[in-house]
């Protein structure tokens, strides 16, 4: 009986360890954005609005050149936003936005599962290719492989089979947005 229990326990642990983690570890992701320092940012509004998403990129290192967090909405009527990072805390951080800081992250709020962050680079193209907004604001498309992804799930909804979007942990505590893996 004791051996049977040990075998069952080992199998449960084996299956638990093999469960697929939805969080991508392909590229490092670390992003932090505070509403205290940027209270009017569309990023703060977006993270609280189900079905809304933005693309976030960063430029500058915060030491030799000023750091900027650039935000582009999935709503074409909303102007792009350039947030200059001035606080010492934010400038000390090393922002890593997945596959490429120039391509960035897609951050938003799903309709059913709260805050979400995805890599904005197509996971199915061997060359880093930025995803583009479609006419439907909750979808992105790769102009190279023509796959369309649904941002609520990260899954392909049109085009050849392949990998889902690279997803990162994302939280908003009412003050700070964090994306990481």
Predicted ranges, named:
Residues 2-8:
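Sec-dependent signal peptide recognition
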Residues 13-16:
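C-terminal motif of bacterial Sec signal peptides marking the signal peptidase cleavage site
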Residues 21-134, 168-181:
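N-terminal pre-ligand scaffold of iron-sulfur
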Residues 100, 142, 161-165:
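Short solvent-exposed loop/turn micro-motifs enriched in small/polar/acidic residues
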Residues 116-159:
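Acidic, glycine-rich flexible loop segments
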Residues 147-181:
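Short Fe-S-cluster ligation motifs
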């Amino acid at each position: 009986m004791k051996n049977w229990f040990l075998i069952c326990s080992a199998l449960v642990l084996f299956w638990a360890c093999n469960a697929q983690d939805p969080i991508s570890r392909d590229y490092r992701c670390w992003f932090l954005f505070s509403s205290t320092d940027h209270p009017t940012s569309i990023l703060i509004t977006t993270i609280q609005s189900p079905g809304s998403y933005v693309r976030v990129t960063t430029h500058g290192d915060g030491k030799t050149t000023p750091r900027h967090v650039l935000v582009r909405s999935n709503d074409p009527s909303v102007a792009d936003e350039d947030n200059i990072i001035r606080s010492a805390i934010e400038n000390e951080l090393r922002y890593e936005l997945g596959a490429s800081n120039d391509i960035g992250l897609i951050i938003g709020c799903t309709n059913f599962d709260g805050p979400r962050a995805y890599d904005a680079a197509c996971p199915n193209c061997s060359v880093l290719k930025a995803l583009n907004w479609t006419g439907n604001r909750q979808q992105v498309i790769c102009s190279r492989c023509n796959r369309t992804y649904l941002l609520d799930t990260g899954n392909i909804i049109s085009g050849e089979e392949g990998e889902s979007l690279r997803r990162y942990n994302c939280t908003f505590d009412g003050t700070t947005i964090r994306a990481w893996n």
